[in-house]
Curated annotation (Swiss-Prot):
The active site is at 97 (s-selanylcysteine intermediate). It comes from the Bacteria. SUPFAM superfamilies: Rhodanese/Cell cycle control phosphatase. InterPro entries: Rhodanese-like_dom, Rhodanese-like_dom_sf, SelU. GO terms for biological process: tRNA wobble uridine modification. Involved in the post-transcriptional modification of the uridine at the wobble position (U34) of tRNA(Lys), tRNA(Glu) and tRNA(Gln). Catalyzes the conversion of 2-thiouridine (S2U-RNA) to 2-selenouridine (Se2U-RNA). Acts in a two-step process involving geranylation of 2-thiouridine (S2U) to S-geranyl-2-thiouridine (geS2U) and subsequent selenation of the latter derivative to 2-selenouridine (Se2U) in the tRNA chain. The gene is selU. Belongs to the SelU family. It comes from Escherichia coli O9:H4 (strain HS). Monomer. This is tRNA 2-selenouridine synthase. GO terms for molecular function: transferase activity, transferring alkyl or aryl (other than methyl) groups; tRNA 2-selenouridine synthase activity.
Length: 364
């Protein structure tokens, strides 16, 4: 059984999306995990806490004995069955615990006794995490071109279509605005950073990468924030601004926020609950900027939203949403973005409609 322990080995694991059987407790996994990891813990949260307390009070031998006592009999067999199935399903995978210590070695030895030889990550999650952090710092040093533009300019799609593009909003599972949430919950900060590092490593490995194409994001994307090393480089980057006609932007926003989100909610929850979730999603987005709109304007737009939802429910048409979306763009989102862009006007190197910006980016 060959353990992986060099920096290049760790990077290769992330680039290849090597399946990782992570045997840490669920609470540890939730705080941060690698993108291709599945959590099949040796100990659950309560068992881990009990062993930790025993270690502090009575030392390592007593803690180890308690661990074996807690994970025995039927409990051990159930977990063995899960590990065995995961190993057979992922023959190219590896075991991982916090630091490549006792937990992954214990699981490895139990599997070996059952006739399965399976490698483990020397250094564990901590080593992989440090590799992810270091890779992001290193790769962020390459030149960056940012795609800017008002809401509905199709920036994310443009980034997605570039071989050197990294979709930060897709990785964050959030579109960055008050209406930006998706049906997927956002990852923990560490897991988001690990996913970003893996995506940058994979993108870099596929080509002789000269520069990154990223969307012009603020520091926060929902509850996730960009790594400081990347954010700092983005503040210095050249910006290409998409300037599409207002009507085209409205078509994109109608497709993305009304048609697609309604479809996604009903697909996930069924027609009745999906409709309620969709309505709450739109109201929550508007409510998030209530203070900036002012109470009177917020109440007016919220009433127009209710009317639009009634129309959509009875006729299927989303046209009614323009009554509140158009003023929201013209009075709030567009002025806010233009103000932000003015502060970095010297960084703007190209302006044009979507197709023109796409051609310009490809030529860089």
């Amino acid at each position: 059984m060959q353990e992986r322990h060099t920096e290049q080995d760790y990077r290769a694991l992330l680039i290849a999306d090597t399946p990782i059987i992570d045997v840490r407790a669920p609470i540890e996994f939730e705080q941060g995990a690698m993108p291709a990891a599945i959590n099949l813990p040796l100990m659950n949260n309560d068992e881990r806490a009990a062993v930790g307390t025993c270690y502090k009070q009575q030392g390592s031998d007593a803690a180890l004995a308690l661990g074996h006592k807690l994970v025995a009999g039927e409990i051990r067999q159930q977990r063995m069955d899960a590990w065995r199935a995961a190993c057979l399903q992922n023959p190219q995978g590896i075991l991982c615990c916090a630091r490549g210590g006792q937990r992954s070695h214990i699981v490895q030895s139990w599997l070996h006794a059952a006739g399965i030889d399976y490698p483990l990550v020397e250094g564990g999650y901590k080593a992989l995490r440090q590799t992810a952090i270091q890779a992001t710092i290193e790769l962020a040093q390459k030149p960056i071109v940012l795609i800017g533009g008002c809401t509905g300019s199709g920036k994310t799609l443009l980034v997605q279509q570039q071989p050197n593009g990294v979709d930060l909003e897709g990785l964050a599972r959030h579109r960055g605005s008050a209406f930006g949430r998706t049906l997927q919950p956002q990852l923990s900060q560490a897991s988001f950073e690990n996913l970003l590092a893996a995506e940058m490593l994979k993108t870099d490995a596929r080509q002789n990468l000269r520069l990154w194409v990223l969307e012009d994001e603020s520091r926060m994307i929902g509850s996730n924030h960009l790594p400081e090393c990347l954010r700092e480089r983005m503040t210095q980057a050249a910006i290409a601004v998409v300037e599409d006609p207002f009507e085209i932007r409205l078509e994109r926003l109608n497709e993305e926020y009304f048609l697609r989100m309604h479809h996604d909610f009903t697909h996930a929850y069924g027609d009745e609950q999906g409709w309620q979730e969709y309505c709450e999603y739109l109201h929550h987005g508007l409510s998030a900027i209530k203070r900036r709109l002012g109470l009177q304007r917020y109440n007016e737009l919220a009433a127009q939203l209710d009317t639009a939802l009634t129309t959509q429910l009875t006729t299927g048409s989303t046209d009614g949403h323009l009554a509140w979306l158009v003023p929201l763009l013209k009075e709030y989102y567009d002025p806010m973005y233009r103000y932000q862009l003015e502060k970095k006007a010297e960084k703007v190197v190209f302006r044009g409609e979507w197709a023109e910006v796409a051609e310009w980016v490809k030529a860089q």
